[in-house]
Amino acid sequence: MAKDQKIEKANNFSGTLKRIIKLMFTQYKVSSILIVFFALASTVFGIVGPKIMGQATTELFEGLVAKISNEGSINFEKIARILLTVLGLYILSSLFMFIQGWLMSNISQKMTYDIRKDISKKINTLPVGYFEQRTVGETLSRVTNDVDTLGQSLNQSFTQMISNTAMVLGVLVMMFTISPVMTLIALALIPISGILLGAITKWSQKYFKSQQDMLSDVNGQVEESFSGQNIIAAFNYKEKSVKEFNDKNNQLYTSSWKANFFSGLMFPVINFVGNLGYVGIVFSGGLLVSKGTIGVGDIQAFIQYIRNFTQPIGQIAQSMSEIQKMAAAGERVFEFLDAKDEENAEVLETVTNKEGNVVFDKVKFGYVEDQIIIKNFTSDVKKGEMVAIVGPTGAGKTTMIKLLMRFYDINGGNIYIDGKDISKLDRSELRSYFTMVLQDTWLFKGTIMENLRYGRLDATDEEVIEAAKAAHIHHFIKTLPGGYNMELNEDASNISQGQKQLLTIARAILADKPILILDEATSSVDTRTEVLIQKAMNKLMEGRTTFVIAHRLSTIRNADKILVLKDGDIIEQGNHDELLEQKGFYSELYQSQFAE
């Protein structure tokens, strides 16, 4: 939406509302039923009050007339009984309103809590492709802003809609019992209000949807600016970054003020229509009293009912504003929860002895089905072999690893691990084969010990320390304040890039998996650290199948097999010396890197 500025309504407004209500009455059935009961009971007691209060007014008026004409006096005892009855009704109404408000707040918070749990589970079941097609900010916006909006709007709108709808219907009944003529005048307000509300709702709904989408874009922009701050500064990109943010922020501002402006029109419009109704009621009521058709107390009660009639219509209008926000946010949340999970085969095979033999058999793949980028990939990798995958950018090196780990499913051919077709293996079991060391080191906020133990959660402290020693990082850790208990910050910026790389290698050593993936593992560290890493890697790779993706060909001279990719196909295979002798594409790449 940020790209083409198209503003549109929620795709399935009524469907989203039905799903939210169904969720309420399915997962929180008892509380939801009690909410409806207490909301209706509170409304009924509030509706009866004015009619009974009118009796007190009539009694007082008739008593005054009788006293003036010396025919009687005011019956204060009867008036007191009436007022005590009304007081009791209003106390019960307020008590029931408090109970339903407490229950509704509890349900909305539980729903928010449960949806966040569902989203957390969902994140771990979605394919990698889902996240590669969306920004981090967009996903975060659904987890935070959209879920919060859903919960808050539900809390503010659901009981109001029940109470106000019941109030309107109940008040109509009470008004008919007083005067059908004045009631018909009041009813004339409904179609006028409905037409105006319909027009306002139509305009405001599309802007509420736009507001939620633009908020997602702004979050994405902020996240990118924060995570890429060093790059932005290095390339003197600050002004353009600020401009891009301001553009998105302005779009959010425009959508937000339009949404709130149109929704804000609802109450004053309804209030204006209600005031017109008062004029008609006072005029017709005066005529009816003069004819003796109704009493003075009836007019007092009817005017109170008119207020109780127009006020809930205005509150319904305000509730519609919240419901529109709830629907827009709910649609985005449900869209995330309904996203297709990674699929497993119906009949799963198991592997009892994990060795690490890998076979690519005529593999074909394209991110878009009609745009195949890997056309005919075939290779046989034996247990313990080191296989380097090289080629220019876009040749399909990283894609091959994603296919091996089933982050994506292939379009043709087969991939086998230890004789088992990976499409027949459970994804979690398949991925238990692998450990990875990437150039983009990922360390979470926590202690160094916790980060290393992420490789194997049941590892003892001694095993973690041994892995650190094997990765030549133990001595450095001991020099840090707190040693293994030192806390890394959110992006581990309180240690160097080389140290982060060594920690990820130690984590991989601790994981002790049969297949190792190295993606540019030594391309962002200094020479001394690279030597330490290479020593640790040589030990780690012993007896393990290793796939190395690197542009620096000097790091893969000792590979058992080098696969040279170009345009998705393996055009050359062999070890370093054999490929140089062929004087083909690999030789050209190698010579170009070492040309003076």
Positions of PLM-derived features:
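Transmembrane helices of ABC transporter permease
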Residues: 27, 31-44, 89, 156-210, ...
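Short intracellular "coupling" helices and adjacent cytoplasmic loop segments at the cytosolic face
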Residues: 2-10, 109, 117-141, 145-147, ...
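Helix-loop-helix
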Residues: 174-188, 258-331, 336-337
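ABC-type nucleotide-binding domain
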Residues: 345, 351-596
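An intracellular "coupling" helix at the cytosolic face of ABC transporter transmembrane type-1 domains
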Residues: 22, 26-29, 128-129, 147-154, ...
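Hydrophobic/aromatic residues in alpha-helical transmembrane segments
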Residues: 49, 53, 100, 104, ...
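Membrane-integrated ABC transporters
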Residues: 1-46, 61-82, 99-104, 108, ...
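Alpha-helical segments in transporter systems
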Residues: 30-55, 86, 101-105, 151-166, ...
